[in-house]
Amino acid sequence: MANIKSQKKRVLTNEKAHKRNVAVKSSLKTAVRATREAIAAGDKAAAEAAYKVAAQKLDKAAGAGVIHKNQAANRKSGLAVAINAL
C-alpha cells in the first residue's frame, strides 16, 4: 500500500475505474457474441439487430477509452462483413 495520501486516493480511483472497465468489456463481449451466434445460425434479421447493439457498445467503449478506436472499427468491420456474407 502506498504511503502518500494522494496515491492512496488514486488506488481507490483506479479500482473503481477497473471495475467499470471490466463491466463495459463484459457487456461488449456479450453483445459481440450474440451477433456472432446470430450469424452462425444464419438469421440475417437477428444478426443485423444484434449488430446494431454491438456497434453502439463498441463505439461507447472506444469513446470512454476502454478499447482503442481502431479495435472498435476493426470489430465492427469484421461483423459487418460476416453479416453481408449471409
Swiss-Prot record:
GO cellular component, one term: cytosol
Keyword rRNA-binding attributed: yes
GO aspect biological process, one term: translation
Any one GO molecular-function label of the UniProt entry: small ribosomal subunit rRNA binding
InterPro entries: Ribosomal_bS20, Ribosomal_bS20_sf
Alphabetical UniProt keywords: Ribonucleoprotein, Ribosomal protein, RNA-binding, rRNA-binding
Classification via SUPFAM superfamilies: Ribosomal protein S20
UniProt record similarity statement: Belongs to the bacterial ribosomal protein bS20 family.
Task of the protein: Binds directly to 16S ribosomal RNA.
The name this protein goes by in its record: Small ribosomal subunit protein bS20
UniProt source species: Bifidobacterium adolescentis (strain ATCC 15703 / DSM 20083 / NCTC 11814 / E194a)
Lineage start: Bacteria, Bacillati, Actinomycetota, Actinomycetes, Bifidobacteriales
